[in-house]
Design a protein with these regions (language model features):
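Conserved active-site and SAM-binding loop architecture
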Residues: 1-158
Length: 158
């Protein structure tokens, strides 16, 4: 979901954040468990105290800003865009071999991954083989970064 999702595709991308949040809060109140909700930058305005994570913080070829909401404190990453250089995009329904690819409005978001293998490399994913899966994925470095924080919180609480 994103608040900037075009109106004609909103049926395919409903805002499930409030529903999921309520279910997770109920579960956490019963169990004492911790949770994280992930979404794209356009959803940050409907998330509660979201933190931003950027691929440049992990030396990845993607920036892939994602926002995370949790029922515990999470530390965000810094962005290191200058050190990273031109990011590689992994999005859409196919890789893009055309170096001069531009969006319909004429702007560029950077260079798009040229192949599935290229997408896997810049995302830090070595097991996925389908472009759609890679384009939808959260880089494993993000999961490790946030998962380590959750484990630390659980160990502290024990």
């Amino acid at each position: 979901y994103s608040s900037i999702t075009p109106a004609h595709t909103r049926d395919s991308h409903p805002d499930l954040i409030p529903v999921v949040r309520d279910l997770l809060k109920t579960w956490a109140a019963r169990t004492g468990g911790l949770y994280i909700i992930e979404n794209v930058p356009g959803a940050a305005r409907v998330m509660e105290n979201p933190v931003k994570v950027c691929g440049s913080a992990f030396g990845l070829g993607v920036r892939r800003h994602r926002y995370f909401e949790s029922n515990t404190f999470l530390t965000p990453t810094e962005c290191f865009h200058e050190q990273q250089g031109r990011p590689i995009g992994v999005y859409g329904d196919h890789p893009q071999e055309d170096e001069d690819y531009r969006r319909p409005d004429g702007t560029r978001r950077g260079t798009k991954a040229k192949t599935v293998e290229h997408g896997r490399e810049v995302m830090g994913i070595d097991w996925m083989t389908d472009w759609d899966d890679i384009a939808d994925a959260v880089p494993p470095a993000y999961t490790h970064f946030l998962g380590t924080q959750l484990l630390d919180r659980l160990e502290t609480a024990a």
